[in-house]
From Swiss-Prot:
A Pfam family the protein falls into: Ribosomal_L32p
Coiled-coil segments on the chain, per record: none
Source organism (scientific name): Bacillus pumilus (strain SAFR-032)
Highest taxon listed in the record's lineage: Bacteria
Protein name according to UniProt: Large ribosomal subunit protein bL32
GO cellular component, one term: large ribosomal subunit
Keywords, in A-Z order: Ribonucleoprotein, Ribosomal protein
InterPro entries per the UniProt record, alphabetical: Ribosomal_bL32, Ribosomal_bL32_bact, Ribosomal_zn-bd
């Protein structure tokens, strides 16, 4: 099995890991109730999506 010829430096290791981070979700205000929600998702407070009532009891 192959082994690394040289030890990976702290800088190279950290530069490689710069992309391993959490993404911030795109938050927008709901046009119906004004509550903050994730874009392209159903609003949790009023249950609407694209102007239609999706969450009905």
């Amino acid at each position: 099995m192959a082994v690394p010829f040289r030890r990976t430096s702290k800088m190279k290791k950290r530069l490689r890991r710069t992309h391993f981070k959490l993404q911030v979700p795109g938050m927008v205000a709901c046009p119906e109730c004004g509550e903050m929600k994730i874009s392209h998702r159903v609003c949790k407070s009023c249950g609407t999506y694209k102007g239609k009532d999706v969450k009905s009891n």
